[in-house]
């Protein structure tokens, strides 16, 4: 019965979906903070203004008010308002006091803002689907390798310390140069760090930086066009809120009881003028920020990798490049995800101690630090592995006991056979 119950549990466990393992770098930022700020403001502000415009339309009702004769019923007056609102984009039915002004801009003002919001979101969408997956995999590889370089340094420093302790105390001249002996570590621990070689290849690559510059260029052009449109709309909004409308068409064309023209006024123009001014001011302030994003990769910052100069054979001088390339962009994203890089925190502590201390060898300090756990679940051993290890340990103990008993039985058998050979009476 117990065997059947156990077999049933195994069968049902095979059908259960396994929970996905938790990734090590689960909070990687694949967009720079300044770019994310520009996208949120440039896209979110028009959407907010559109919601305010539609809220005003819902609260007021109609967007136009036409002066109808007192002889008109309320249905006839509503027909005049609806007809003139629908004929706003038709120049033949309208006549403005200021000339032929594009009155349709007032009618489609919220939708034009929505169009700008969509256009400004396209660069972020393009970056997310074309560049972010490749960037994410590269950042995970680089950060894992940086942690591995740090772990190898600790392992090498501890092995050198154990070697010195095993050899025993030496003469005074040797003890004075203990720091130097720790630096002279076997090249097998640090020979050709793969992360250093991989980062050097990014100096000659420009695929990622071209995508980044293209996205920033599209954002700049769209914001500039939006500023031109908003300034133009703000300048003409106060001149074109009133116009004359004719409804004589079809069966009403020869009706003498209907006036030739109706005086109409767009009610929402004042609100739209205020919204366009707010949007224009914010976009004008965003233009210098967008221009600044063009020059961010040109800074060539290597502050994060400079900390790793404490480790042997890790040379940051080879990472400094000129002009725009992928390496400058990778340095920026490493700086953006510095909170996920555990080895950087430890090496930063060593750098501060080394700068404040007097003649302290960082390799000696490495022996006091712990290694970074590179497990997927960050050092947490699954319970299944623990129970499996315990079962294997118990099996080893049982096998060991069996081996000992078999060896004892064999020894007893050999002893008895020797006694029979020595004693002829047996």
From Swiss-Prot:
The gene is Panx1. GO terms for biological process: ATP transport; calcium ion transport; cell-cell signaling; monoatomic anion transmembrane transport; positive regulation of interleukin-1 alpha production; positive regulation of interleukin-1 beta production; positive regulation of macrophage cytokine production; response to ATP. Residues 62-106, 238-277 are extracellular. GO terms for cellular component: bleb; endoplasmic reticulum; endoplasmic reticulum membrane; gap junction; plasma membrane; protein-containing complex. The chain crosses the membrane at residues 41-61, 107-127, 217-237, 278-298. Its main location: membrane. This is Pannexin-1. Ion channel involved in a variety of physiological functions such as blood pressure regulation, apoptotic cell clearance and oogenesis. Forms anion-selective channels with relatively low conductance and an order of permeabilities: nitrate>iodide>chlroride>>aspartate=glutamate=gluconate. Can release ATP upon activation through phosphorylation or cleavage at C-terminus. May play a role as a Ca(2+)-leak channel to regulate ER Ca(2+) homeostasis. Widely expressed, including in cartilage, skin, spleen and brain. Residues 1-40, 128-216, 299-426 are cytoplasmic. It comes from the Eukaryota. Keywords: Calcium, Calcium channel, Calcium transport, Cell membrane, Disulfide bond, Endoplasmic reticulum, Glycoprotein, Ion channel, Ion transport, Membrane, Phosphoprotein, S-nitrosylation, Transmembrane, Transmembrane helix, Transport. It comes from Mus musculus. S-nitrosylation inhibits channel currents and ATP release. N-glycosylation may play a role in cell surface targeting. Exists in three glycosylation states: non-glycosylated (GLY0), high-mannose glycosylated (GLY1), and fully mature glycosylated (GLY2). It is found in: Cell membrane; Endoplasmic reticulum membrane. Homoheptameric. Belongs to the pannexin family. The record marks 375-378 as: Cleavage.
């Amino acid at each position: 019965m117990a065997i059947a119950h156990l077999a049933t549990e195994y069968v049902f466990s095979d059908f259960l979906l396994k929970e996905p393992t938790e990734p090590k770098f689960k909070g990687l930022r694949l967009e720079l903070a300044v770019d994310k700020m520009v996208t949120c403001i440039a896209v979110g502000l028009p959407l907010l203004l559109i919601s305010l415009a539609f809220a005003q339309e819902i609260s007021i009702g109609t967007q136009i008010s036409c002066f109808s004769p007192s002889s008109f019923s309320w249905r006839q007056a509503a027909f005049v308002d609806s007809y003139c609102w629908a004929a706003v984009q038709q120049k033949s039915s309208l006549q403005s006091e200021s000339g032929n002004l594009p009155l349709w801009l007032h009618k489609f003002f919220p939708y034009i803002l929505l169009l700008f919001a969509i256009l400004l979101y396209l660069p972020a969408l393009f970056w997310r689907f074309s560049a972010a997956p490749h960037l994410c995999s590269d950042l995970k590889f680089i950060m894992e390798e940086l942690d591995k370089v740090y772990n190898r340094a600790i392992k090498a420093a501890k092995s050198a310390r154990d070697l010195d302790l095993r050899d025993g105390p030496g003469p005074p001249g040797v003890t004075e140069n203990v720091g130097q002996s720790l630096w002279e570590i076997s090249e097998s621990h640090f020979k050709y760090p793969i992360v250093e070689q991989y980062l050097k290849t990014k100096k000659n690559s420009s695929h990622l930086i071209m995508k980044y510059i293209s996205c920033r260029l599209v954002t700049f052009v769209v914001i500039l066009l939006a500023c031109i449109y908003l300034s133009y709309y703000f300048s003409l909004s106060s001149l074109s809120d009133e116009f004359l409308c004719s409804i004589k068409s079809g069966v009403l064309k020869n009706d003498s009881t209907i006036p030739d023209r109706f005086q109409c006024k767009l009610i929402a123009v004042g609100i739209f003028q205020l919204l366009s001014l707010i949007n224009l001011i914010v976009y004008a302030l965003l233009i210098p920020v967008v221009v600044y994003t063009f020059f961010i990769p040109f800074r060539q910052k290597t502050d994060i990798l400079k900390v790793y100069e404490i480790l042997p054979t890790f040379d940051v001088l080879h990472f400094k490049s000129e002009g725009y390339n992928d390496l400058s962009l990778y340095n920026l994203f490493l700086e953006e995800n510095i909170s996920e890089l555990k080895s950087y925190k430890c090496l930063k502590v060593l750098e501060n101690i080394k700068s404040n201390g007097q003649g302290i060898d960082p390799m000696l300090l490495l022996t006091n630090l712990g290694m970074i756990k590179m497990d997927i679940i960050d050092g947490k051993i699954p319970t299944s592995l623990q129970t499996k290890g315990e079962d294997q340990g118990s099996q080893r103990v049982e096998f060991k006991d069996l081996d000992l008993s078999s060896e004892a039985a064999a020894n007893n058998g050999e002893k008895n056979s020797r006694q029979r050979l020595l004693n002829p009476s047996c």
